[in-house]
């Protein structure tokens, strides 16, 4: 959570998200102290080991969150028509440069528009499931 806080503070400054993450960090730190006092209150070296272990776990979790968040962006799409798996997605406006993002939790699929707006394919481990999820959701404009 510490790394996630720094990420939001530097790259995506949003006071509400920053406050939520900061409070989460405080609660996280209090939990570490609570566990440390229960397990072995006299052993300071174990406390340092716990902090290092939790920091590594925290970094991995936050890195995955940032990576997934970055991959949730959909570029150069105005209106999309969802087709079958591995079939190009047709767009109604090819000149639109507005950024859109798929708005559902735990984004696991993205639209690859790096080559050509008319030749976009859904990228996912399970394309059919990905299509179902996107068809049930709307594309909203990034702020």
Swiss-Prot record:
Topological category with respect to the lipid bilayer: Multi-pass membrane protein
Annotated Gene Ontology cellular component terms: membrane
Glycosylation site positions: 71
Highest taxon listed in the record's lineage: Viruses
Transmembrane regions: 16-36, 48-68
Keyword Glycoprotein tagged: yes
Keywords of the record: Glycoprotein, Membrane, Transmembrane, Transmembrane helix
Localisation per UniProt entry: Membrane
Transmembrane as UniProt keyword: yes
Name of the protein in its database record: Uncharacterized protein R302
């Amino acid at each position: 959570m510490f790394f996630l806080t720094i990420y939001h503070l530097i790259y995506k400054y949003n006071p509400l998200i920053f406050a939520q993450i900061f409070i989460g960090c405080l609660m996280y730190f209090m939990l570490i102290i609570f566990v440390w006092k229960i397990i072995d209150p006299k052993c300071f070296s174990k406390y340092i080991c716990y902090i290092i272990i939790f920091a590594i776990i925290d970094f991995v979790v936050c890195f995955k969150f940032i990576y997934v968040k970055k991959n949730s962006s959909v570029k150069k799409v105005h209106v999309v028509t969802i087709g079958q798996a591995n079939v190009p997605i047709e767009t109604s406006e090819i000149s639109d440069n507005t950024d859109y993002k798929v708005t559902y939790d735990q984004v696991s699929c993205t639209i690859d528009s790096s080559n050509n707006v008319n030749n976009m394919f859904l990228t996912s481990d399970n394309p059919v499931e990905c299509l179902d999820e996107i068809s049930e959701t709307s594309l909203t404009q990034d702020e």
